[in-house]
Amino acid sequence: LNYIMTVINPDALKKLSDICAQLEIPMSVALHGRGTAIESMRDLLGIDSTEKWIVFSVAGEEKTKEYMNRLRRTLYIGVPGHGIAWAVPIKSVGGGKILAYLNDGRQDARYTPEFNFSYELIVAIANEGRTDTVMNAARAAGAMGGTVLHGKGTTSPESEKFLGVSIAKEKEVILIVARKEQKADIMRSIMTRAGADTDAGAVVFSVPVSEVAGFGMFDET
């Protein structure tokens, strides 16, 4: 199973919903977000706005591949400015019925497919209004851009004391997909320039990505 995240322009949401319905992909949730590409990059890609929709879905291995293929064919994911998508492998699911629901009726989760983790998803949780600080740090280490979600921290007071920052505030969640070779440098730069000891108060971690679409423009030729 994979947890799929797709970042698209607002006018593509209906088509993406149709793809999910056609493939019978359950548990699709759409959230409003914004891109972080700098103006020169937006001009290069022909992007007029940073407004985005982030769609979260769950799908098995085969459906994930078909989903990515349809994104490329139908939404032109891979063409600059049309969006990106990535999938994170799910290690476990609570309950056999839920597993069957998410995995086309199959409850056997013993098979673990082999993945080539060429990319990783970097997640940085920072104080509200500090996205630019985080992204400037990330770009200094080679990141091309990211997607921002707005939220609120819910951590206990004990965690606040441990980290030395206030967690129960408005937060920005910055999602950055990067090549695995760049991941350590990007995370190190964020921690140094925007980490827990700074005004940004960023906490950063990464997870492997099993499938991607829309990142070919960054590939070396």
What residue ranges belong to the model's regions?
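Positively charged, small/polar-rich N-terminal and surface patches that mediate targeting and assembly
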Residues: 1-221
